[in-house]
């Protein structure tokens, strides 16, 4: 079942200086199936960040539409957007975005607190999740007391605590060392196998090689895509590297 549909998305900005029109997206179209793990790649300025902001209901396209389970994001009333994001989307950021004055436990539970859930409901949702992610032993610590990898695991737990329809990850390995990055990517594979739909924007070939499909954006359009098929991570890594070389040299992918 298609959980996300992106149809002919366009986005035009007015430049801050000079007033020129800048077209960041020029007609992006793709869909994501429930349970898929999709990575989006592209050079700086290709439109990845603009697209992610639209998918996160943080911005609206100037043309086209985005539908999550058949619901148009641009049709949601402004007053309802925060609740929609909280109930349907999970977010994992490069810089973790944990609150230093909150314990790890309180950071994870924050979306449920904002949703008005009972203490019993919150504990029931959190306990199996933190055990699965291997952070049940750091819940009473504060973010500044744990490692970068543990912070990112806590951020993933916070993103998944509401059982989101779609998990959006923005450069999730960008602030991690190689060991913590590998750990996080294995964790993403695990939660994806359990049925979580993931859409990840990344510059990292290694991170993208863990996905089931990779979309490449160039000059505001989807330029090419690769399906994993039966490829290993190493084989997919090479395919991605070859495609990025084509992007940089301006040649078309075969």
Predicted features along the sequence, with ranges:
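Conserved beta-strand-loop-alpha-helix hinge in the C-terminal portion
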Residues: 221-245
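ABC family nucleotide-binding domain
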Residues: 2-4, 9-213, 217
């Amino acid at each position: 079942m298609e959980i996300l549909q992106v149809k002919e998305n366009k986005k035009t900005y007015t430049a801050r200086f000079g007033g020129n029109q800048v077209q960041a997206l020029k007609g992006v179209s793709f869909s994501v199936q429930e349970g898929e793990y999709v990575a989006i790649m592209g050079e700086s300025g290709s439109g990845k960040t603009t697209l992610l902001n639209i998918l996160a209901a943080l911005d609206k396209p100037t043309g086209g539409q985005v539908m999550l389970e058949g619901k148009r994001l641009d049709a949601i009333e402004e007053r309802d957007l925060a609740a929609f994001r909280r109930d349907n989307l999970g977010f994992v950021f490069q810089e973790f975005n944990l609150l230093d004055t909150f314990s790890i436990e309180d950071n994870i539970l924050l979306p449920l607190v904002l949703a008005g859930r009972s203490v019993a409901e919150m504990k029931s949702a959190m306990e199996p999740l933190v055990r699965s992610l291997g952070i049940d032993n750091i819940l009473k610590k504060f973010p500044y007391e744990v490692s970068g990898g543990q912070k990112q695991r806590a951020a993933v737990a916070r993103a998944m605590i509401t059982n989101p329809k779609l998990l959006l990850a923005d450069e999730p390995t960008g602030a991690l060392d190689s060991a913590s990055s590998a750990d996080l990517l294995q964790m993403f594979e695990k939660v994806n196998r359990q049925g979580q739909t993931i859409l990840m924007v990344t510059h990292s070939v290694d991170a993208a090689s863990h996905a089931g499909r990779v979309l490449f954006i160039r000059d505001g359009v989807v330029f090419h895509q690769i399906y994993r098929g039966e490829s290993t991570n190493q084989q997919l890594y090479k395919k991605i590297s070859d495609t990025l070389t084509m992007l940089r040299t301006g040649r078309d992918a075969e």
